[in-house]
């Protein structure tokens, strides 16, 4: 939405029809994602278990990943670099594109939030007949062994953070797990303190 506000304040940008169309599409993409995310968080806070409503459709995963990366908000004081890798001729994925985008946004946001000033984020997509594998790796603070299972629990926040003022309520990874499992997929985590974190999501091609 910051892109849209900047656009409204820039007269020259508003005169460019192609730019206008792109900014409007990006803004609608972000609004749809925000609406779905807030709705899911409300469900998670208000109920212990509630069925996740998915609206699956076929979409280009590479295009979605690249859009999420492009629209990522980089906080002041952070220098963030991305690298991405995709298989050639990857078929469309049938899943809920809004929730998948939010899952990826959560992982990227965590990678930025729980890292130092210079952040390196690697996003790798693999594809086979069983499904798609999406991995997000970073060079952040890492997670202590005794906390690796707990980080997917609702409202859990690490006690090993070097900066106790990092904002958050502990719902991001809980949301990630719930959405992935609603797609009949799985999520796994590998991490070492001081060496970063790698989170891998597997979604079956025949899940929906």
Predicted regions and their residues:
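Short conserved segment of the HATPase_c
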Residues: 143-155
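Conserved micro-motifs of the catalytic ATP-binding
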Residues: 49-54, 88, 92-95
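Short conserved segments within the C-terminal catalytic ATPase subdomain
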Residues: 75-84
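Short alpha-helical segment of the dimerization/phosphotransfer core of two-component systems
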Residues: 29-34
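A conserved beta-strand-to-alpha-helix junction within the catalytic ATP-binding
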Residues: 55-70, 83
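Short helix-loop "hinge" at the ATP-lid/N-box region of the Bergerat-fold HATPase_c
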Residues: 111-112
């Amino acid at each position: 939405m910051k892109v849209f506000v900047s656009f409204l304040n820039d007269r020259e940008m508003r005169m460019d029809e192609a730019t206008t169309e792109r900014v409007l599409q990006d803004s609608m993409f972000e609004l749809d994602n925000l609406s779905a995310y807030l709705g899911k968080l409300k469900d998670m806070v208000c109920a212990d278990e509630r069925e996740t409503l998915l609206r699956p459709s076929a979409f280009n995963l590479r295009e979605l990943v690249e859009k999420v990366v492009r629209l990522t908000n980089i906080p002041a004081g952070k220098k963030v670099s991305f690298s991405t890798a995709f298989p050639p001729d990857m078929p469309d994925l049938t899943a809920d594109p809004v929730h998948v985008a939010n899952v990826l946004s959560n992982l990227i946001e965590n990678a930025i939030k729980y890292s130092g000033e210079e952040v390196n984020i690697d996003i790798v997509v693999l594809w086979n007949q069983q499904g798609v594998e999406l991995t997000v790796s970073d060079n952040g603070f890492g997670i202590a062994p005794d906390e690796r299972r707990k980080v997917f629990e609702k409202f859990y926040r690490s006690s090993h953070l070097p900066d106790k003022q990092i904002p958050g309520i502990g719902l991001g990874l809980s949301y990630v797990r719930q959405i992935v499992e609603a797609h009949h997929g799985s999520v796994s985590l590998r991490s070492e303190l001081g060496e970063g974190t790698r989170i891998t999501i597997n979604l079956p091609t025949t899940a929906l």
